[in-house]
Amino acid sequence: LFPYTTLFRSIRLRVGRPLFYTYDGGEGFLTDHDGKYVVTREDLKETMEYISGYSLYSYEDEMRQGFLTVQGGHRVGVTGKVILDGNEIQGMKYISCINVRLAHEVVGCADQVMPYIRKKDWVAHTLIVSPPRGGKTTLLRDIIRQLSNGEEKKKMPGVTVGVVDERSELAGSYQGVPQNDLGMRTDVLDGCPKAEGMEMLIRSMSPAVVAVDELGRKEDFKAVESVIHSGCKVIATAHGNSIEDVIHQPYFEKLVR
């Protein structure tokens, strides 16, 4: 593993199967003297106890969503037996898989697109479109950082950015504090539904820009319209193979025309 430790992207543990990892440029399995190391249920139990600081109960709310975020902004997804109360998810037991996605920022990845988004005191409404795992969130994170910090050499002051981080992927917050660098003028609502969060930010935080990841629900688009009508700029992402693919979806068409 040594050559890849600084390049890890994810580590996946499945009960009864080899420990699997991905890194920049490839993937592999953990091996021992008998071959591929096979993960046991005890491995998963010990891993969950360790990453939760031996206080898994404190992550109950996050576990209902199938993941938790730990210090450093690393995201731990879990699968297993879902506990339901009617139609509501109450938690999870008999965990069978843990997927540790290691946080990584690409500072400067938005350099080439910033001239299209920011010109002196002007910020453009922006929609970033790509297929899953195409880098939307990474790009959005750096756009937020650059807008928030501003650029002194170009005499572009920073602006107040409000972020609704519904799934804790942009800021990677741990106990409410962003672990990723989103800039000095950025306020984050962590774990809040996008539609409700956008309304909250407009009412209470006076942002110049509101940023959200992965628009999709009808309620999201209504909230985006409210943000635009308030005079704020919106920067968001959406799943799609192309802009043409997205604008023909029901709620996007009205938004981007």
Regions found by a protein language model. Name each.
Residues 205-257:
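Conserved P-loop NTPase nucleotide-binding/switch module
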Residues 109-166:
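P-loop NTPase nucleotide-binding module
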Residues 54-124:
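P-loop NTP-binding catalytic core
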Residues 119-121, 131-132, 149-156, 178-181, ...:
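Conserved catalytic network of the ASCE P-loop NTPase/AAA+ motor domain
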Residues 2-7:
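Short, small-residue-biased leader/transition segments that mark boundaries at the very start
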